[in-house]
């Protein structure tokens, strides 16, 4: 073995050992917190009261975003929905980076009365802290389940940030949509009492959704590399029958794109209704 190879192996070994030391000495002892000076967009934690088919969510975000810095901040004290009135579950893929695989995913529950509630697993950030994937590997962010009106959560991405966004109608077996919403409510309550760490690979927006889906329907989403690169999830979701097929992958992507439509919106009427006017009607008949 020549000297250069020996030096390279020694350097790699030293870096690995140093990383383990930092993890066990500095990172592992850290405990997730509920109390801190949080950024205003993740300041409050949502909790839920479950009463038969009715679920009341408390502290639902309802910001109006003109830009990422210019916004009207508001939190709704209570939003009550009925699991029997779920119309659709939507899967949103938000491409926030030039690298296609780097994206944010979340779910929106649409109800028959027009209410659209979005659920997003995110990194909870302290004041003056910005998100970075590297920091997320080292227990720098708590896991945060943001519950917000669709006009807030999706409007932020399509209009204020100008990201490329896709919105797919989910396919759920009978009763599973109700169970999924209940799971979301239960998870919100769990995080309000016992905080958890966010992790840039293992506990992200998409892996958290996958985990929730598989708890409702065990084995529904297999272990896939795309789970860790959410930008590539539409292909897998279509193949697995998790989202509606609107004419093959490319056509489905074309029809599901919402950012260009949203950016032409004049602000009149309902943001959610505006989006759905441009999305295909359901191609799957729901079983009762």
What are these regions (language model features)?
Residues 17-34:
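Membrane-interface motif at the C-terminal end of an N-terminal transmembrane signal
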Residues 30-47:
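Alpha-helical transmembrane signal-anchor/signal-peptide segments
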Residues 42, 48-54, 59:
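N-terminal accessory segments that position/regulate proteins before the catalytic core
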Residues 55, 60, 65-165:
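Glycine-rich catalytic cores of cysteine/serine-nucleophile enzymes that process amide/ester linkages
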């Amino acid at each position: 073995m020549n000297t250069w190879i020996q030096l390279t192996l020694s350097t790699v070994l030293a870096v690995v050992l140093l990383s383990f030391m930092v993890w066990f000495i500095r990172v592992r002892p850290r405990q997730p917190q509920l109390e801190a000076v949080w950024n205003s967009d993740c300041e409050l934690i949502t909790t839920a009261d479950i009463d038969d088919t009715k679920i009341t969510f408390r502290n639902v975000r309802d910001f109006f975003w003109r830009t990422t810095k210019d916004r009207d901040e508001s939190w709704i004290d209570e939003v009550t929905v009925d699991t029997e009135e779920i119309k659709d579950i939507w899967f949103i893929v938000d491409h926030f980076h030039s690298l296609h695989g780097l994206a944010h995913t979340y779910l929106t529950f649409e109800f028959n009365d027009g209410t659209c509630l979005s659920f997003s697993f995110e990194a909870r950030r302290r004041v003056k802290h910005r998100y970075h994937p590297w920091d997320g590997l080292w227990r720098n962010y708590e896991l945060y389940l943001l519950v917000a009106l669709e006009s807030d959560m999706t409007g932020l991405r399509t209009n204020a940030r100008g990201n490329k966004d896709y919105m797919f109608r989910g396919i759920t077996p009978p009763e599973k949509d109700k169970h999924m919403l209940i799971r979301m409510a239960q998870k919100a309550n769990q995080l309000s009492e016992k905080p958890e760490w966010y992790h840039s690979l293992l506990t992200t927006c998409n892996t958290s959704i996958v985990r929730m889906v598989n708890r409702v329907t065990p084995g529904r989403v297999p272990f896939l590399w795309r789970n860790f690169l959410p930008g590539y999830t539409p292909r897998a979701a279509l193949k697995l029958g998790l989202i509606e097929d609107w004419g093959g992958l490319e056509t489905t992507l074309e029809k599901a794109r919402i950012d260009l439509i949203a950016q032409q919106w004049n602000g009149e009427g309902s943001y959610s209704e505006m989006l759905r006017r441009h999305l295909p009607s359901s191609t799957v008949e729901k079983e009762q």
